[in-house]
Amino acid sequence: MRRPGTLLAAAVVAAALILTAAAPSGAITFGQPDGNRHPYAGALLADWVPDSPGPDVFCSGTLIAADVFLTAGHCTSFLEEEGISPVGVTFDPAYDENAASPDGILSGTVITHPDFGFSGPGGASDPHDMAVVLLDDPPGITPAQLPTEGLLDELAEDNSLRSATFTVVGYGTVREQKTGGPHGILPIDGVRRFTLQTFQSLEPAWLTLSQQPSTGDAGACFGDSGGPHFLGGETSDLLVSITVSGDAQCRAADKTYRIDTASAREFLGEFVNLP
């Protein structure tokens, strides 16, 4: 969610913990360890916790080409201004945040959507909340699939979305209890997790998914921002949206940013071949 934000602590805690009615998203609620189900889902890293020995998870994302990692714009827009560098990516399903020199961290160049922003004309309706990390070296992982243009609109027209299952993956905070409010949210532990969701609503730039435990759904929380939402069950690799926002309790709804729109595809097309 727009839930990753001292300065990275303030910025990441600001970028990640802007928990209002529409707060950025973090970790998976009521989920389970992903293992190798979604090897192309990764975590965005930076050394932002003063007493931590190595780089820390602050957002999630997805490999969408051999060397292109997609995440959310609110995860990266403040990095240069706050002097947060370097930024890395890991695809380790159980990243060790307590290691001084963790293995497998990939370096790269961050590019935030030039029109990113939640203010100004059309800001909330289409914030262009996207960014990519152009990896210096490909990880040798088969990327996730991207959707065709307008796929979700087509599914909405024939009512397929109403019965569709979605899978969310991320490295964020964890909720395992249905009660307890914010106190029921556990800290990031470096484990990639997944869970399933159902459809709630579709807007021109947004796909809102249920994470109501009362209806058997679950979803994203702090630190899952930028992470993938796949159309289909736990074996699906068809990426249709990314985690951007949700509710402060991480148990009502995920508001995700669509990547099948002409607007999103215009940005993505600068870095990958689109279907």
Where do the protein language model's features map onto the residues?
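Chymotrypsin/trypsin-fold serine protease catalytic domain
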Residues: D126-M130, L134-D217, K255, T261-G269
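Solvent-exposed loop/turn segments at secondary-structure junctions
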Residues: W48, V68-L70, C75-S77, G117-F118, ...
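Short, solvent-exposed aromatic-acidic interface loops
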Residues: I111-F116, Q211-A218, T243-A248
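Conserved catalytic-core segment of clan PA serine endopeptidases
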Residues: I28-R37, S77, E82-D153, P187
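C-terminal subregion of chymotrypsin/trypsin-like serine protease catalytic domains
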Residues: I28, D34-Y40, D56-S77, G83-Y95, ...
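Secretory targeting and sorting signals
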Residues: M1-A27
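A generic structural motif
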Residues: L45-P50, D92-A94, V169, F230-G232
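Hydrophobic residues in beta-strands and at strand termini
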Residues: L44, L63, T71, F91, ...
